[in-house]
């Protein structure tokens, strides 16, 4: 991902304030509520029968935290996202058969959640930088797909 020095600074400054537990669970939960067909990859998570069930599901929260911890690794390696996410790309492609479009959806949901949490601090410039990052991460995760 090509970011200017200002964009990198904006992304890392905001990310330093992110509560990974909270934002991760909310982002994954929103993905599952807004795009219900994504739930088929999470059969083992138990009750996903309603928005309240999804948002309160401890497995959704735990996996959301895991997802954002991986995203954090990507932020430390913006110049090598494909390398950073190579194993995860392989897992999601070969074993889990996740539609790579879902990575884009989750990235966009994450941007919405960040905007919700940070309000005025999430300026259009910060959003533009994050859109570049989530697009780069989605692209890296889709890399192993044929």
Swiss-Prot record:
Belongs to the globin family. The modification Phosphoserine is found at residue 44. GO terms for molecular function: haptoglobin binding; heme binding; hemoglobin alpha binding; metal ion binding; organic acid binding; oxygen binding; oxygen carrier activity; peroxidase activity. Heme b binds at residues 63, 92. It holds the Pfam family Globin. GO terms for biological process: hydrogen peroxide catabolic process. Transmembrane segments: none annotated. The gene is HBB. This is Hemoglobin subunit beta. It comes from the Eukaryota. The modification N6-acetyllysine is found at residues 59, 82, 144. Keywords: Acetylation, Heme, Iron, Metal-binding, Oxygen transport, Phosphoprotein, S-nitrosylation, Transport. Residues 2-146 form the Globin domain. InterPro entries: Globin, Globin-like_sf, Globin/Proto, Hemoglobin_b, Hemoglobin_oxygen_transport. The modification S-nitrosocysteine is found at residue 93. Involved in oxygen transport from the lung to the various peripheral tissues. Heterotetramer of two alpha chains and two beta chains. GO terms for cellular component: blood microparticle; haptoglobin-hemoglobin complex; hemoglobin complex. Red blood cells. The modification N-acetylvaline is found at residue 1.
């Amino acid at each position: 991902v090509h970011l200017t020095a200002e964009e990198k600074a904006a992304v890392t400054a905001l990310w330093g304030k992110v509560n990974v537990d909270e934002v991760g669970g909310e982002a994954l939960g929103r993905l599952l509520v807004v795009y219900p067909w994504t739930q088929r990859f999470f059969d083992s998570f138990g009750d996903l029968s309603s928005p309240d069930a999804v948002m309160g599901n401890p497995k959704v929260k735990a996996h959301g935290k895991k997802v954002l911890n991986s995203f954090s690794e990507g932020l430390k390696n913006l110049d090598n996202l494909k390398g950073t996410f190579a194993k995860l790309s392989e897992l999601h492609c070969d074993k889990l058969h996740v539609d790579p479009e879902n990575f884009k959806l989750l990235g966009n949901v994450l941007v919405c959640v960040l905007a919700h949490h940070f309000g005025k601090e999430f300026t259009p410039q910060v959003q533009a930088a994050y859109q570049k990052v989530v697009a780069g991460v989605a692209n890296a995760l889709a890399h192993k797909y044929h």
